[in-house]
C-alpha cells in the first residue's frame, strides 16, 4: 500500500475563513473516497492548525455526505479511526513538515494557499517525492484528468502535478469523446455549480459583488477558467473553448453543459 499524506494545512485564524471551511471539507471527502474504493492507500498524517476535537467531529459527521460508520474520536496526537491513530501535524510552513521521516510517497496539497508550483514545491523540500495539488496549479509540472491523460504521468519528471478543478474533471472527458469522434472546432461551456465556500452564506462583503450575495438564495453568475484550462490536458483545444459558471442554491450536485461546433 502507498503511504499517502493528506496534507490539509488549514489556517484556523486566517482572515479568509470561507476558504478555511472549504478545504476542511475536501479532507473529509478524500478520506471517504479512499474508504469507499477500498484503495490500498495508507493515510499517514494530516496537517491542520485547527482544534483536533472539532476536526474529529467534522470527519465523523458531514452535513452533505452523512455520518461515517467508523469509530472516530480525538486523541492526544491525532484522530483515532477504528483504533488506528491518524497523526495530526500542526505546521504553518510546509517546509517544516516531517515528510521524510514519515516515509510518505505522496502529499495531497488541498489547502488552496499553496497551489502555485513554487509554493507547493515546499513539500518536496520537506522530503515528499510527489505533490498532488487538488486544484488548478500555475506552473505545475503537468495537469491530469483521470481517464483522459493520466497515462502520461511520468514519476521521473512530474513532481508537482495538478488534478485540475472539479469542473475541468467533469468537462474534459466530454470534450475528448467529441473531439476523438468528430473533431471540435470551438465550443462554449456553462457549468451550473453548487455554491462553494468562496461565497457568502448571507449577504456580506466580498471582492466580487456577485458573490457577496447570499449563496443559498441566489443564482450567482461568475467566471470559470475550466474551459481555457482544458488545453493543459488536451493541447489541441488551446484557444478553442470558453465558458461561464452559474452558482446555484444547492449545497452539492453540479452539471456542465457544452455546445460545440464540430468538424464532421
Which residues does each predicted region cover?
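C-terminal substrate-binding/catalytic lobe of Rossmann-fold NAD(P)-dependent dehydrogenases
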Residues: 181, 186-190, 199-264
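N-terminal Rossmann-like NAD(P) cofactor-binding subdomain of oxidoreductases
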Residues: 3-4, 8-212
